[in-house]
Amino acid sequence: MALDLRIGNKYRIGRKIGSGSFGDIYLGTNVVSGEEVAIKLESTRAKHPQLEYEYRVYRILSGGVGIPFVRWFGVECDYNAMVMDLLGPSLEDLFNFCNRKFSLKTVLLLADQLISRIEFIHSKSFLHRDIKPDNFLMGIGKRGNQVNIIDFGLAKKYRDHKTHLHIPYRENKNLTGTARYASINTHLGIEQSRRDDLESLGYVLVYFCRGSLPWQGLKATTKKQKYEKIMEKKISTPTEVLCRGFPQEFSIYLNYTRSLRFDDKPDYAYLRKLFRDLFCRQSYEFDYMFDWTLKRKTQQDQQHQQQLQQQLSATPQAINPPPERSSFRNYQKQNFDEKGGDINTTVPVINDPSATGAQYINRPN
């Protein structure tokens, strides 16, 4: 990628920071203001171009909480380009940062926002169809506690936005999305509807609690055979077994989503209340203190203590008051490798939770 490529005569392309279902994502800079943005590029020679469609979906969803704002779309040289808000790390990156386990409090804090994001997308007559940790990114700066949903390359309208006429029930459909989090009906080839996005979210929440899902790492010679094995394991694992060791609300959630009929409107408020009531019974405080926030704070405090000790060692005759915490960003690279070999991510993490800068990531494909 040429580093001097300009997008819309206003944005300079930088290094690659991630990949979506269709196209790669680069760090960009507004050459006038210096503001950093994310730029998604797709070759104009792509066999099945999707970026313009994704841009149209973003436009329809524009203004929703946790929906990134698109600043520019057009063709530049041999690329379709979309310029949008720069966001922080994905939930998959943060999961790795937290040693691949989230506390119950963090899972419940996330569940509340994630259900709301899906509800908003559905209210605009769209399905996401690829609900997974990689497609949820935290904000930066003042919006650092807000979960954002991205990657609408596989999104699909499930009803007419005026008449609300639902798409027809169909079978023999190919699997769309990510097999690990796909609903059972999606595996069975049934047309996706609202229930499927929510079932996928259920698997994401259980994944965060458990650290992995029973159908991860299954061996097969072809992709089709692997999908079949995942489906068989998913069907044969009762929700009570899948959620064993965790509050029954997770099993109740999954059983509810699986009980919905094709064109049913889910009761999003009921699902949120399910987890909010559990949150209250656990006497948690709604303070946005996620696991990664606490870990960064611990790292920051340790670093501050080390700096203080170094100062005292260097000047034993004069004991000075500890320096004020600086606002610089200290990036720390860590490589994480998920068992099964499908993730190998370098995640530069900001140790200062109050930092206003972006956290650049290389997201898994």
Curated annotation (Swiss-Prot):
Region (Disordered): 301-365
Domain Protein kinase residues, every copy: 11-279
EC number annotated for this UniProt entry: 2.7.11.1
Keyword Nucleotidyltransferase: no
Reaction catalyzed: L-seryl-[protein] + ATP = O-phospho-L-seryl-[protein] + ADP + H(+); L-threonyl-[protein] + ATP = O-phospho-L-threonyl-[protein] + ADP + H(+)
UniProt similarity note: Belongs to the protein kinase superfamily. CK1 Ser/Thr protein kinase family. Casein kinase I subfamily.
The protein's name: Casein kinase I homolog hhp1
Organism: Schizosaccharomyces pombe (strain 972 / ATCC 24843)
